[in-house]
Amino acid sequence: MKGLEKIIPLDGRDIKVVLQKFAPQAAGSILISSGETAVLVTANRAAAREGIDFLPLVVDYEERLYAAGRIPGGFLRREGRPPEKAILIGRLIDRPLRPLFPQWLRDDLQVVATTVSLDENAPPDVLAVTGASIAVLLAQIPFNGPMAAVRVGLVGDEFVINPTYKEIERGGLDLVVAGSPDGVVMVEAGANELPEADMIEAIDFAYEVIRDLIQAQRDLLKELGIDIVRAEPPAIDPTLENFIYDRAAEPVKAILKRFEKDKNVRDAALDEVQGAIAQEIAALPEDDPVAVAAAENPKALPTLFKAVTKKLMRQQIIEEGVRVDGRRLDEVRPIWCEVGVLPERVHGSALFNRGLTQVMSVTTLGSPADAQALDDLHPEDSKRYLHHYNFPPYSVGEVKPLRSPGRREIGHGALAERALEPVLPPKEEFPYVIRVVSEVLSSDGSTSMGSVCGSTLSLMDAGVPIRKPVSGAAMGLIKEGNEVRILTDIQGIEDFLGDMDFKVAGTDSGITALQMDMKITGLPVAVIQQAIEQARPARLHILEKMLAVLDKPRPQLPPSAPRLLTLQIPPDMIGLVIGPGGKTVRGISEQYNVKVDISEEGLVTITAPNETNAKQARAAIEGLTRKLNAGDVYLGRVTRIIPIGAFVELLPGKEGMIHISQLAEYRVGKVEDEVKIGDEIVVKIREVDSKGRINLTRLGIHPDEAEAARSNSVV
């Protein structure tokens, strides 16, 4: 099967799509590639299940190690559960797709993207996003597309489209933008304190290219004779709709105008109104048109009641400029923070509160051996900074079974990690592995940005010398026709009933992370610009509150933190320090109660429970790698005896010979009369000859030299 191939020009990094060749039973399938990176994307649709009241969309992203010419490790030698990076790419595909499906659609939808080939010049994620749009269109699923995504990086002072991994790493910007014909649908960015104006310019630059990719998809569909499927929402019985609106409008409006600060009180009041309407419907005769409509659609009441609440909340914001808790549109909720909230056994801790959102962040410092090993398709082989986010059910007052972290928790942790990574000290200056855990103790919106703020304080409480503190705010949007209102520091109900969740994190100098998700089909860049600009004073206000509690990292690490010392050894001496079968390094570790990690470049990191042990272990390794010179004094161990003298191990793997005449001031008849195998004796190097042979003596050693040798012995 030959299939249909098309090339989409893209700034020198063309995209090739192959249709009608792979996965012929899938409703829509495409192989999309750039360079040697190729992603197979499929889309399928199944009939709606009974009782579903949401859009059942599942997006899966999978990586096959054969894509990079590798065989998986482990006993089974096959891929297991998706690595974290694959989960994040799955979310990256899902987030711009989801708002473009009709929200009333109840058919089961599944999009599967599989990276089948990978090179270092073309990351697969943005290809998968664009490929998902094409696959959905080919599957003839109702969709407000086309949609496409590009990545923007910085090379010098120039923005580039779809940069290589190396260009991303060097440039200080990793921005992914997805867009539809209506505007930008999704933004995901990590940056090295990029000024707001530059970030806005980069988003605008990306969307101009996205327009071309959208047009290319339209041209492709036209050539295939395929129309984009649009569909009208199912009709709602006006009798039931009017009944609910007439009874809900005034009570809901009154509740929203109470300006209640506590969401639980507000939610309880709204539930009471909905419950009263439900009771009134239940009391109607069975043949009443309202009762009949409610019986035919049991989920109509909660759906329509939500619609009334949404309409009135949005109306209040647009017409009166006031929010349900009484705040102005650009006002941040009350903030209070505290550091050192846990006992000193914990390395660093902080509690961050904003309104009813509360996050506790805890920092732990570890050795290089604690770094997370990565076994996926991406260039990084390990991570020294880990940020984990937990969202237990009690944070929203619910009772649910505890499960392993889901996609949302992994995504929020990755966002906080991305926000803080640019301000962390380089490992050459601070060799610790850093783990921060953000525990959401109470949630009323913007918990991910609460994690960023709490984690900044926690890191400083642990004595991590971050370059600058980072704060974050979540921005929202209400859009009705041409009326647009940007909301600062959104709470739960504004996120739930609003049109946008736009998280902005950064320092006082610029942005370190962005994440924008939409519930509408797109926004002009001008509106995004307004949101980014409105976020800055909010971030600085939050930062001021944080710094009032702790304005800089503590000068000392906590007593409970391990002590790390580093030293550089020549790479050709790594084997000497490790020893045969690891004997030497294991001996040092056991003797001084330390962990020793050695990089391929010869950087030795010693992790110890206290500074004394660390220094002793460092002295031992320095002794191992020290060049032996005439006049040096060592405490050595006798390893062999021959008639004319004895061999003495000075350092692991380094022996010298002491002649029988150099064993004592007096004449020695037999070597065994003076020393035995296993004896520890103090010796001085007489000479190192041209062949590297070491000649020793026990004569002429000052008592102070002997004592120093005993103190620094490594044999």
Swiss-Prot record:
- Quote the EC number: 2.7.7.8
Matching PROSITE patterns: KH_TYPE_1, S1
Domain (S1 motif): residue spans on this chain: 631-699
Sorted keywords for this record are: Cytoplasm, Magnesium, Metal-binding, Nucleotidyltransferase, RNA-binding, Transferase
Spell out the subcellular localization from the entry: Cytoplasm
- InterPro entries, A to Z: ExoRNase_PH_dom1, ExoRNase_PH_dom2, ExoRNase_PH_dom2_sf, KH_dom, KH_dom_type_1, KH_dom_type_1_sf, NA-bd_OB-fold, PNPase
Q: Name one GO biological process term.
A: mRNA catabolic process
**What enzyme category does the UniProt record give?**
transferase
Instruction: Work out whether the entry's keyword set contains Iron-sulfur.
Output: no
Pfam families attached to this UniProt entry? KH_1 (PF00013), PNPase (PF03726), RNase_PH (PF01138), RNase_PH_C (PF03725), S1 (PF00575)
- One GO cellular component from the entry? cytosol
What are this entry's molecular-function GO terms? 3'-5'-RNA exonuclease activity; magnesium ion binding; polyribonucleotide nucleotidyltransferase activity; RNA binding
- Which positions fall inside the KH domain? 562-621
Q: Which residues bind Mg(2+)?
A: D495, D501
Give the SUPFAM superfamilies listed for this entry: Eukaryotic type KH-domain (KH-domain type I), Nucleic acid-binding proteins, Polynucleotide phosphorylase/guanosine pentaphosphate synthase (PNPase/GPSI), domain 3, Ribonuclease PH domain 2-like, Ribosomal protein S5 domain 2-like
Cofactor names: Mg(2+)
Reactions the enzyme catalyzes? RNA(n+1) + phosphate = RNA(n) + a ribonucleoside 5'-diphosphate
Q: Which NCBIfam families match?
A: polynuc_phos, PRK11824.1
Q: What does this protein do?
A: Involved in mRNA degradation. Catalyzes the phosphorolysis of single-stranded polyribonucleotides processively in the 3'- to 5'-direction.
Q: Which PANTHER family match?
A: POLYRIBONUCLEOTIDE NUCLEOTIDYLTRANSFERASE, POLYRIBONUCLEOTIDE NUCLEOTIDYLTRANSFERASE 1, MITOCHONDRIAL
HAMAP family this protein is in? PNPase
The entry's family comment says:
Belongs to the polyribonucleotide nucleotidyltransferase family.
Its protein name is Polyribonucleotide nucleotidyltransferase
Taxonomic placement: Bacteria, Bacillati, Cyanobacteriota, Cyanophyceae, Acaryochloridales
